Amino acid sequence: MTRSEKVEIIAKLEEGFKASEAIVVCNYRGLSTKKLEELRNNARENNVKVQIVKNTLANIALNNSGKTGLVLKDTNIYLWGEDQLGVSKVAAKFEENNDKFEIKTAHIEGEVADVAKVKALAKMPSRNELLAMLLQVWNAPITNFTIGLNALKNKKESE
């Protein structure tokens, strides 16, 4: 790889890392190409970027984008995106289904996070699920009131 190619890779990573709310670093050693393609497809559906990069290049891009503190060793695959829940869910779900895939560390909301935090975020409901729950709570009193009025109307009609 030439120096200009490395500079280009660093620039693309830096741009992606700056725009991201979450970066998850995982070990992928031993995964087949088919499994990696499955991970990429899942990530693409959730607007999550996935890339395997040399640690030295990733470290430079992370430091340039202000995401410091991650210790990068061995083989790593990087997942990042604007939605921290989406990134966490993709990584945690894939780890559940694949023994050879392991979440190592993460950088979420400006600070280094451990595996437990990533898994905790993955269990949280998404924004759309939370909005649906909120709408259910708001609609419940109106629905119950309407049911009560209909029951009263039916009772009056039957008399």
UniProtKB/Swiss-Prot annotation:
Listed InterPro entries: Ribosomal_uL10, Ribosomal_uL10-like_sf, Ribosomal_uL10_bac, Ribosomal_uL10_bac_type, Ribosomal_uL10_CS_bac
GO biological process: translation
Gene3D superfamilies: 3.30.70.1730, 6.10.250.290
The keyword rRNA-binding belongs to this UniProt entry's keyword annotation: yes
Keywords: Ribonucleoprotein, Ribosomal protein, RNA-binding, rRNA-binding
GO MF entries: large ribosomal subunit rRNA binding; structural constituent of ribosome
Recorded GO CC terms: large ribosomal subunit
HAMAP family: Ribosomal_uL10
Role this protein plays: Forms part of the ribosomal stalk, playing a central role in the interaction of the ribosome with GTP-bound translation factors.
Family to which this protein belongs: Belongs to the universal ribosomal protein uL10 family.
Database matches in PANTHER family: 39S RIBOSOMAL PROTEIN L10, MITOCHONDRIAL
Subunit note: Part of the ribosomal stalk of the 50S ribosomal subunit. The N-terminus interacts with L11 and the large rRNA to form the base of the stalk. The C-terminus forms an elongated spine to which L12 dimers bind in a sequential fashion forming a multimeric L10(L12)X complex.
Stated name of the protein: Large ribosomal subunit protein uL10
